[in-house]
A protein has these predicted regions:
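Hydrophobic alpha-helical segments within soluble ligand-binding/sensing domains
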Residues: 40, 85, 146-181, 198, ...
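Short beta-strand->loop
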Residues: 47, 148-150, 182-195, 233-236
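Short, solvent-exposed amphipathic alpha-helices that sit
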Residues: 54-69, 155-159, 194-221, 225, ...
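Hydrophobic alpha-helical
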Residues: 102-122, 203, 227-306
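Hinge/cleft segment of the Venus flytrap/periplasmic-binding protein
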Residues: 178-183, 187-191, 195, 207, ...
Length: 367
């Protein structure tokens, strides 16, 4: 009798232990899974590099939004290597990723983005490209693909208009050698990148349109021998170091004392603008009262750029809303999870068709 009771007690203990273990396992699986039309698993977010200041801001915003929502995610740093990023995508898919959020490295051709779509579509996983340009034909090739970015041409237009109006406020003061024209240098972030191409072109064209409407001549690139009329980051990293090196070389030959000083600096992004400011300050410019200040303009409105605008060493920037970009990505992920059209709930003014979101720009001069 006692032996039978003992056996029953042992059985019940084992039963309850097994039940508890199963319930715990189910709880863990549900807590760790983001879930989506692409299957159970984490959201995999791929950045072209962690070292880009603007992208770091997007990453911080997206990490917080996903964490606050209780979604499981993993961030990948490609360190500017498309080969690395493609391998990371393959690994994430093999691990059962629920969605791929991709800041693609190679924007010079469609091959990289199309390859990622091919990998994702084979496993029915949604893809959200963001920030770095992907062609419309690539996006349209997969019905579970969305691009979150900007109307990339608009940044150049807005920057050019801002620069033109800024120069007109005190044109003679910015014309340091009194020749009636403003000389400039343009720092381009990357060859073959649609955003860099548009910013480089339209910043100058729209600035000239503003000046010429006011009866002023077009701005002139400081080096007549440079047919491109820009200096590009040869590594394609839009980096402050590239701009600092270029600007330091320029300042070794051009100065107010020589009467040939570069009178305006235009950069494709704030990192390059800040690099130019660093070189200028090392040469004694843009240091506040008592020093000559060269107007410097960027794009992104990073915290570092805002600080330089506040102290007067930088003139203005175009805000690219990283937090707004992160929120749009989260909304699209939710829509895929709920099997809704991906752009549901996003302001129609910021959408193009059914597969693109343009986060709006705004001018920032510290006012």
């Amino acid at each position: 009798m006692l032996q039978n009771i003992f056996k029953r007690v042992i059985f019940m203990k084992r039963f309850f232990a097994l039940t508890a273990a199963l319930l715990f396992a189910v709880f863990c699986l549900s807590a760790c899974s983001g879930g989506s039309a692409g299957g159970q698993g984490e959201i995999s977010v791929f950045y072209y590099t962690f070292s880009d200041t603007y992208i770091s801001g997007v990453r911080s915003s997206l990490d917080k939004i996903l964490s606050d929502a209780g979604l499981s995610y993993n961030d990948y740093d490609a360190n500017s290597s498309q080969t690395t990023q493609t391998e990371q995508v393959q690994t994430a898919i093999a691990k059962g990723a629920s969605a791929l959020v991709v800041n693609v490295v190679d924007t010079g051709s469609d091959d990289a983005a199309q390859n990622i779509i091919n990998l994702a579509s084979a496993s029915n996983i949604p893809v959200i490209f963001f920030n770095r340009s992907v062609s419309e034909s690539v996006i349209a090739s997969y019905d579970k693909c969305v691009f979150v970015g900007t109307d990339y041409e608009m940044a150049g237009h807005m920057q050019g208009e801002m620069i033109g109006n800024y120069l007109l406020q005190n044109y003679d003061a910015y014309d340091l050698n009194g020749d009636g024209k403003i000389s400039y240098v343009m720092f381009k972030g990357q060859e073959g990148n649609l955003e860099a191409i548009a910013r480089t072109q339209y910043a100058v064209e729209d600035c000239n349109a503003v000046l010429e409407a006011a009866g002023k001549p077009a701005i002139e690139f400081y080096d007549a021998a440079n047919a491109n009329k820009y200096l590009v980051d040869q590594d394609g990293n839009w980096s402050s170091a590239a701009a600092t090196n270029y600007m330091s070389t320029i300042l070794a030959r051009h100065s107010t004392a020589n009467g040939n000083m570069v009178e305006l600096v235009i950069a494709n992004n704030d990192e390059m603008a800040l690099g130019a400011v660093s070189a200028l300050q090392s040469a004694g410019y843009n240091k506040g009262a008592g020093s000559v200040t060269i107007p410097v303009f960027g794009v992104d409105a990073t915290d570092a750029a805002k600080a330089k605008i506040a102290d007067g060493s930088m003139a203005g920037t175009i805000k690219q809303d990283g937090e707004g970009m992160a929120q749009a990505i989260k909304t699209i992920i939710d829509n895929f999870n709920a099997a809704q059209p991906p752009l549901t709930g996003i302001d129609a003014e910021n959408t193009v068709g059914t597969q693109r979101v343009n986060v709006p720009y705004s001018a920032y001069t510290g006012e």
